Structure formats: C-alpha cells, structure tokens
Amino acid sequence: MRRLTACVKATILICAGLAGFLSHPHSAAAFDRNKAQLFAVLPDGGTLPEGLAVAPNGDVYVATFDGSKKIFVFNENGGLLRTLTVNPSSGFLLGLGFHPQTHAFLVIDFGAGKVLTVDPQSGGASDFITLATPAGSGLNALTFDAAGSVYVSDSFKGAVWKSGPTGASGLTTPWVQNVLLTTTGDPPFGANGLAFNKAGSILFVANTGNDTIVQIPVSGGTAGTPAVFVNSINGADGLIIDDQDNIWVAANQSDEIVVTDNTGKVLAKLGDFDGLTKDGTPNGLLFPASPDFSRDKKTLFVTNLALDLRVGTGNPANVAIDSAWTAQVKHWTVSKINTQFQALPNK
C-alpha cells in the first residue's frame, strides 16, 4: 500500500509539473509564421516570376525570368491591370524598382547584362546602365541611396555596380568587388538582394549560394571593406529593410521569409510551403525570390519563382529538396504575408 501511495504521489507530482510547464506563457514559444496567402496567380503562360516592386501608387509589378519579356501589373488587391512586353530586351528580367526621385521604372535585363528604363504603360525600353563588358555578368537586384544613386548586384562577378540618378554607359569598374560576394555554393548565385540601412551607412547584400548577408560600410558614397553580417539564411535571395532597420530576406531554399534586427538576431520566420493544389498551383511559398512592402507597410508581397534547379542550372544532378515539387508546378504565383508578427519572448 505504501508503495502504491508513493507511486500515486509521484504521478500526481509529475502531472502537476507538466501542467505547470505547459501553462507557462513562454514554455511553448515558437515562431508565429504568419501564413503566406495567395495574392495573385500569373495569367496562363506566365512563368518564373522573379523581380517584384510596388509602385508609388501601390500597384505591384512582377517581372518574369522565362524569356517572354513579360511584366505583369496588379492592383493592390491582386487584380491584373495589364501585361507589359518589355522591348527591346532579352526577356530574362530580374530586379526592378521605381527611382525615388525621378520615378523612372528600372528593370534589370539579366540576359543582356544591363539595366533598362521601361515605360510602365507600354513596356517600351531603353538603356539606363550598360557595362563595357557585359559577358559573364549576372546583374540581379537593384536599390537606391538617398542621393538617388543606383546600386546593382552582380551575382557572377561578386560585385556591386553604381551609377548616378540618370544612369551610366559603358561602366568598366564595379563600385565594390569582393570574394564575400562570390560563391561556389548552390544555388550558384553570389551577390543578390541589397538595401541600405536607414542611416545610409551600411549596404546589406544577400549572398544566395553562401547563405549569408554581407555588410558593406559606406562613407561619402565610397564602399568600405565588406564583412559577413550573419550566416545561415538558406538561399538568401531578395532583401529589403523596414523603418525599424529590420532586415527581411527571402530564403529561397527553405521557403520562408527571415526577419532579423540590425544586429542579425532573428525576429521572425514567416510563411511556409504547404504543397500544391490539384491544378499545380503552389500553396504558400515555393522558392520565394523578391519581397516588397505595400504602401502602408502592412503587407509583404513576394514572388514564388518555383524554380527547378536541375533545369535552371542545366545540371540534372543539381537536386534540391523542392525539385520534385517545382517540377509539378503549372501555375505561378505571388504571395502576401501580414507584416505584423508576434515576437519571440526575450527573457
């Protein structure tokens, strides 16, 4: 009887302890992932959405990386407004943005190794930035500083190019070039998304193949020595910075948006991949590429490139954990995520 009584007491104590643990407000803390919702499905035939930018009026511009020369323009509710055919161009379009001062619509033509000025109504294009030697370049993403200068990442040369507010012709020397902006990893893209902190004193650059964010100190428009800011963002792709200097990064190999503070401490991991519908449409994030905020900053829009790396790199052996899923995609999407998230408790 004493042994039974002791067992009962022990069981009661264990259960009480477990109940207390489970009821503790911080015991089950986890990332509040803010489910990625469908914003828009590209029209039939539209594939590989990569670049994304929100216009001053709130419209969402989405560039395709499929050779079609297409940019799709959606309203803030995801309704298709028009389809632009960017001409002349190679059709392999990546980063895009609206100049904060001139309001020029700039689009990277990856295939031609240049940056274009594009008419946002007609799609007519002209050169904005050209390189003296475009062969071997990998122009990918762009951003602006307070003076209106334009900065363009080069994934293959491990560099960032710079022009003034009106562009440049025949650039020969990158603004900065460094081994930390190159990669031998996978996906095989080095310098990618980039953005300045609010003080304009640091340019942050994602390195996709290295899973890193690199910080470049800036003084008087001149680049300092790059250094690794933070590691382990799986496939760090597009990158933007909010008004609190938090850094939002599309992690294209883990199908999530990673948010860090200005010290590199992770604050949130948002979104996830939730499989495909019967018609081959992704639920949630699948190879998220380029994020941007809505005008009121309450929503994050992000393209789902859904790229099969075996096809994208031309190497059948280049299998990623999402390859079997991306191979089944029939309809490409843009997602939206609520930017208000519950921060983890910080004891």
Model-derived segments and spans:
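Short loop/turn segments that connect beta-strands within beta-propeller blades
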Residues: 74-79, 119-124, 164-168, 217-222, ...
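Blade-level signature of beta-propeller repeat domains, shared across WD40, Kelch, NHL, RCC1
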Residues: 292-347
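Short loop/turn segments immediately following the C-termini of beta-strands
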Residues: 65-66, 110, 155-156, 165, ...
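Asp-box/WD-like beta-propeller blade repeats and closely related beta-sheet repeat scaffolds
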Residues: 112-149, 153, 157
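A short helix->beta-strand "capping" segment at the edge of beta-propeller domains
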Residues: 30-46
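Residue position within the beta-strands of beta-propeller blades
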Residues: 61-63, 107-108, 152, 205, ...
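Structural signal for beta-propeller blades
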Residues: 68-71, 113-115, 158-161, 211-213, ...
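Beta-rich, blade/repeat-based domains predominating
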Residues: 44-59, 87-105, 132-150, 180-202, ...
